[in-house]
């Protein structure tokens, strides 16, 4: 089978990498298309993948630029799929769905964002896609008949214990020792981030002071510029090692929904300070069913301080959250193995 993947974000690469390797081992042909996005291309190069970059330059954020880039990606995916003689197209972007529809080939959309969060992307994608492979709680609106639900999360495709083992020696090699809190600041510039608030400089300073007063070191992983007062707290590591650092943190304080899910997969307590609170079904399930993460809206900074103090005062916090993680893992599947089986047996498994 000729299987074409399109990747528009580093997290999408992590999601498919273990399945893609297994598909190749099983004798299938795999082609990977990407666009330039953060560390995505570096990850593929370091792992030795062959790929084609169909959008090498960053686009502007104006609506016309977004639509133009989307149209060009669809055209590029269409041409690449024809040359490759793709039997199936897989990815999150609307270009996969639209190209598959034009070629009359199965197009599989993989995501875990609810339709209310990605409304515009859903409008460009769901009418054309063949199936939507998503975690069971993920809402897809009127396209429910296209949904293939699974008991898991996209982050389990690479952070499941079958694929990832945290290594404390990697953390120590950076001179990170003792108890520490990781603060993650996201850029919040994606189309679905419009109007969403997060952690501001003033509040981050207060959180750093609070965790230090409680005997913890503070490290900041940031996609945004830091002020001079916070720059000394910047986490300086190789980007591939972030999950090891996250795994051994006493707490994650973040306005990144993605890293909050990753923390839950690793059993690291997390507080997500974001106006997405209550709007993302995957995170709500992780909070309500497993108590692995806690959401607080941005108009409640005092609540953030209180929850931080509560978690850092727990004497058995690591053991407690690892037990919660084990409960979650016992009820979820190996997502990478599921994706491999889904593709190899398509359309029987759905």
Where are these regions (language model features)?
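Conserved nucleotide-sugar phosphate-binding/catalytic loop shared by glycosyltransferases and other
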Residues: 7, 24-69
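Catalytic donor nucleotide-activated moiety binding site of glycosyltransferases and closely related
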Residues: 47-60, 102, 188, 205-237
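Donor nucleotide-activated moiety binding/catalytic core segment of transferases
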Residues: 73-80, 219, 223-259
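A donor-sugar binding/catalytic signature common to diverse glycosyltransferases
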Residues: 88-99, 109, 245-282
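A conserved, positively charged/aromatic
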Residues: 108-110, 118-132, 246
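A nucleotide-sugar donor-handling region in carbohydrate enzymes
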Residues: 129-198
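Catalytic binding pocket for nucleotide-activated donors in carbohydrate/polymer assembly enzymes
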Residues: 265-316
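C-terminal amphipathic helix plus adjacent low-complexity
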Residues: 313-350
């Amino acid at each position: 089978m000729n299987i074409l993947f399109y990747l528009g974000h580093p997290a999408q690469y992590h999601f498919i990498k273990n399945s893609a390797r297994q598909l190749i081992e099983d004798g299938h042909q795999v082609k990977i298309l990407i666009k330039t996005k953060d560390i995505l291309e570096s990850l593929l190069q370091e792992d030795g993948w062959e790929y084609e970059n169909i959008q090498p330059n960053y686009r502007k954020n104006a609506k016309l630029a977004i639509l133009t880039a989307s149209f060009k990606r669809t055209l590029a995916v269409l041409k690449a799929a024809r040359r490759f003689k793709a039997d199936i197209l897989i990815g999150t972007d609307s270009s996969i769905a639209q190209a598959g529809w034009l070629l009359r080939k199965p197009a599989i959309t993989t995501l875990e964002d609810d339709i209310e969060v990605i409304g515009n992307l859903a409008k460009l994608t769901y009418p054309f896609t063949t199936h939507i492979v998503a975690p069971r709680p993920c809402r897809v609106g009127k396209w429910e008949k296209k949904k293939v639900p699974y008991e898991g999360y996209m982050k389990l495709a690479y952070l499941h214990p079958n694929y990832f083992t945290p290594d404390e020696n990697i953390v120590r090699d950076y001179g990170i020792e003792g108890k520490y809190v990781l603060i993650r600041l996201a850029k919040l510039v994606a189309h679905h981030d419009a109007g969403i608030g997060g952690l501001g400089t003033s509040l981050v300073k207060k959180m750093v002071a609070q965790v230090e007063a409680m005997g913890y070191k503070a490290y900041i992983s940031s996609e945004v510029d830091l002020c001079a007062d916070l720059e000394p707290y910047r986490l300086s590591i190789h980007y591939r090692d972030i999950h090891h650092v996250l795994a051994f943190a006493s707490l994650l304080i973040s306005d990144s929904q993605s890293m909050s899910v990753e923390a839950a997969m690793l059993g690291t307590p997390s507080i997500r300070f974001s106006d997405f609170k209550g709007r993302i079904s995957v995170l709500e399930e992780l909070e309500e069913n497993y108590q692995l993460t806690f959401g607080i809206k941005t108009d409640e900074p005092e609540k953030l301080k209180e929850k931080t103090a509560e978690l850092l005062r727990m004497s058995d916090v690591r053991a407690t959250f690892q037990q919660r993680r084990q409960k979650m893992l016992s009820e979820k599947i190996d997502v990478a193995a599921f994706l491999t089986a889904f593709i190899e047996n398509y359309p029987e498994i759905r």
